Amino acid sequence: MPTRSKIIYTFTDEAPALATYSLLPIVEAFTASADIAVETRDISLAGRILASFPEQLGTKAIPDHLAELGDLAVTPEANIIKLPNISASTPQLQAAIKELQAQGYALPDYPETVTTDAEKETRARYDKVKGSAVNPVLREGNSDRRAPLSVKNYARKHPHKMGAWAADSKSHIAHMNNGDFYGSEKAVQIEAADAVKIALAAKDGTTTVLKEKTNVQAGEIIDTAVLSKKALRSFIAAEIEDAKKQGVLLSVHLKATMMKVSDPIMFGQIVAEFYKDALAKHATVLEQIGFNLNNGIGDLYARIKALPADQQAQIEADIQAVYAARPALAMVNSDKGITNLHVPSDVIVDASMPAMIRDSGKMWGTDGQLHDTKAVIPDRCYATIYQAVIEDCRANGAFDPTTMGSVPNVGLMAKKAEEYGSHDKTFQIKADGVVRVTDSQGNLLMEQNVEAGDIFRMCQTKDAPIQDWVKLAVNRARASNTPAIFWLDPKRAHDGVVVEKVQAYLKDHNTEGLDIRIMAPVDAMKFTLERTRKGLDTISVTGNVLRDYLTDLFPIMELGTSAKMLSIVPLMNGGGLFETGAGGSAPKHVQQLLEENFLRWDSLGEFLALAASLEHLGVTYNNPKALVLSKTLDQATGQFLDNNKSPSRKVGNIDNRGSHFYLALYWAQALAAQAEDTALQAQFGELAKTLAENEATIVAELNAVQGKPVDIGGYYAPNPELTSKAMRPSNTLNAAIAKLK
C-alpha cells in the first residue's frame, strides 16, 4: 500500500479508546473501498509508559508510537486522526503503572524521592509521560477550530440546558494583583540562532545551572516570568477568609495536566494554606508517610491508611475540624466526599470554568446543591477573561444557544509555542537570588529576582509559527467573511513583541475588505460577547493557552460540549492532523460502562475529523473515491444529527455503539444514493439494504447487553479481546461489516 493512501488512527485512553473498538472496524471497512489503509498507533498513557522502558520489558517491549508520529507530523504525507488522551497527573501515572505491573509488565515503581542515578533516570522517563506529553509532539502546525454548520444548526434546534443567571450573583474570579507571572514577565527577540543558558545565582554566592542549553532561532521570542510563593500564600489566605465572609464556595481552577510543573506546585501551596492547622499538627508523621501536597489532600487520605487506626482517626478528625472552620469547598463528587482539593487533575480550568458559567455561575457543594462560588485562578494572564464573562452574564443573563453566534478559533501552537512548551524550562527555586538567562557568549538577556519556593519559567515562541498563524487567520477571515480579532495584551512583555510581528506580517497579505483587529483579551472578550449575543460570528485569533481555553468556553456555551468541534491542524510541512473535538477523555463515561455496560461517549468529533481527513487525502493525492467518502460522511453526519441518533445518557436507550450503527447506515445510504462513483454506489447499495432491513435486530442486539456490569480487563490497559467483545455485541452488524471488507 503506498504511503500516500494511509490514515493513522490513534488509540488513546478512557472513553474515546473504548469507542474506537466499535467505530474503527466500520471505518476500516468503508475506507478500504477507496484503497485507503487505516492504521493504528498506540499513544495511550499505558502505551507511552511501556514504550519508555524497552530494556526492562524484553519481549514484551512495544515501539514508541508517539515518537514515530512526531517524525511523521513533519512530513507532507502525514494524515493523523488524533483522539483525546489522558494528560496524566502523578496519581494517574502511579495508578497506570500499578495496573501494568499487575498485568505482568516488569516496570519499575515511580520513585517519589530520588537519590540514586538509577532512580533519577527512572523518574525522568516517567516524568516525560506526565502532563500533556502527546499534543506538543504532534502539533507541528497551528490550530483551526470551528463548529461545523450541521452541528451549529442542530444545537439551535435542540438547545442544551443553560442555568439562569441572577443579577446579584456573588460568583466571581479571584486572582493575584502582584507577585504573579503576569506582573513579572520580560521578553526579548533573538537576533541570530544561538543557545541560551538558565542559571540561578544564589545570594550565598553559589551558581546553579537550571538548564545548560536551550537552542533558539533568529526571530524567536523568549520570555521569563516568576510567581512568588509568598505572594501566592498571602493571596490565598486572604481569599479563604473572604469566601468564608461572603458565604460562597471556594474553588481552585488550574491546569495541572498541561502545566505539569508549575500548576501542581500552586495547587500544593493552596492545599497547604487551606489545611494548614491540621498539616502543621501532624507534620512529622505526614513527612514520614511521604504525603505530597502537590498531589492534593486525596494523597493524605490514601497514605494515612498505612497508619494505626487511632492515629488515622485523629488526623481525619483534625481535617474535619478544618472543614468546619473554613469556607465550604466546591465538590468534584459530593456523594463520595471528593473536594476540589483532593486531586490536582480533577478540576481543569478550561473545562471547569465553562461548566460553572453554564450552571448559573455556581458549583456543587457538600449538600449536593449548586452555590455561588469564588473561583481562584491565581495568575492574571488569563483569569480576567473569565471575570468578563461572569460580568456579562450578570448583566445580560445566560447565553441562548438558539440564537447566539459562533466563535471559531485560530490558535498559535506550532513548535510548542508559549506557556505550553515551558515545562522543561520551569523550576521551583531552591534559594533566594537571581535567575539569569544568558547567550552563548555570556551576555545577559534577561534576569529575574527570586526567593526560595518561587516558580520560574521561560517560554519560547518561534517566528515561522507566528507567520503561519497570521496567514491562517487571514485565510479564515476571508473564507468565512468574519471579523478576526487577535487577543494580545499590550501590558504583557511577550504579547508586546507578538503585536509588532503581527502588524508586520499582516502587510504580507491582502487584507482588503477584511475586519482584522488587535485587542487586549478583556476588551476582545467584551467585543466578542456583544456580537455573540446578537447572533454574529467572530473569529478569535489567540496564543496557545487562550486557544485551549476559548475552544472549550465557546463550544460549551454554543453546543453543550467542546467534543463537537471540527479541530484541524494544517501541519506546516503540508500534512494534516485532525483532532476529534476539543474535549477530554471522559473518565465518568468509563465508570458507567463498567457498572452498566453503557457508553455515553459521543463520537461526533471522530465523524467530523474523519470527513476532514478523507477530504485532505482526496485533495492532496487526487483520490476521487476519498472525496466521495468524505462528502457522503458529511451528509450522513447531518442526517445522524437531524434524526437525533447521538448517544443518550441512560440505560435502555441508544449508546455509543448504537450511534455507530446509525452512522454506518446513513453513510452507506448516502453512498448508495450518490452517482459520482458507480462502483461505490453498487458496493454500498447492498450494505445499506442489509443494515436497513436488520435495523430492529441490530438495535435489539446492541441494547440487550446494557444494564449489567462488564469486565474489560483493565482501565488504563484494557484487554483488547474483552473490550472488542464488549464494544461489538451485535453479531448481525459485525457480519454485515465483515462482508463489506
Predicted region positions:
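Short active-site loop/helix that positions an aromatic residue
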Residues: 273-274
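C-terminal accessory extensions/subdomains outside the catalytic/core fold
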Residues: 718-741
